[in-house]
Amino acid sequence: MKKIVLCILVVYPLLSFGQIGVKAGLNFSNVTNTSSISHSNRTGYNIGIFLAPKSKSIISSKTELILSKQGYNYLTNSVDGTADLLYIMLPTYLCINITRFFQIHIGAQMAYLINAKADSKTASGSTSPVSDAMQYYNRFDYGLGGGVEIHPFKGLLVGTRMNISLANLYKDAASGQVPSFASVNVKQNLFQIYTGWHFGKQPASSNKK
């Protein structure tokens, strides 16, 4: 009973301050500046929570805490393989309320890498995991993002977003890195689709359309 009361005391002020909610969806991620290899999108997931302070104006804001699995598939002259990366992401967006049902998001994000896996497959079909793959990647990432979000009814939301990383994915062009690059200027792009639910009453926008 005490735990329930404590949870109510913690959550209620958040509800009065703004809308909190949950969201989950799919990631389609890839890399850029990789002329030495062929690469393709890798599908992952995103799941997390958000806080959107209440606002009746056209401009509002939204902060999220997201667990995001992303990466890419690659192909060289001799091997192909995958890279899987797991991040904790902290995006913050400026929300433009076109109507009470439709928002445009523009903002930035930071991310911290908590796990990394990579492998390579030879022409013979044998797959070799990369030992201690985390050592090759930069832990911190940052970039810009933008997208749209629809609020069709009640607490439901559906959205899409594009994130462009400004940080190098790899620390350096280290020997033994899989796949290997002549330059470390490799960056990530991430396209997300998601759905979610926000709790608390949605404030009416000054734009009543």
Feature names for model-found ranges:
Residues M1-K23, T195, K209:
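Bacterial Sec-dependent N-terminal signal peptides
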Residues S38-N77:
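Glycine- and aromatic-enriched membrane insertion/assembly motifs of diderm outer-membrane
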Residues V22-L26, Y45-P53, L67, L90-I98, ...:
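Residues on the lipid-exposed face of transmembrane beta-strands in outer-membrane beta-barrel proteins
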Residues N27, I150-L156, N185-K209:
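Outer-membrane beta-barrel "beta-signal"
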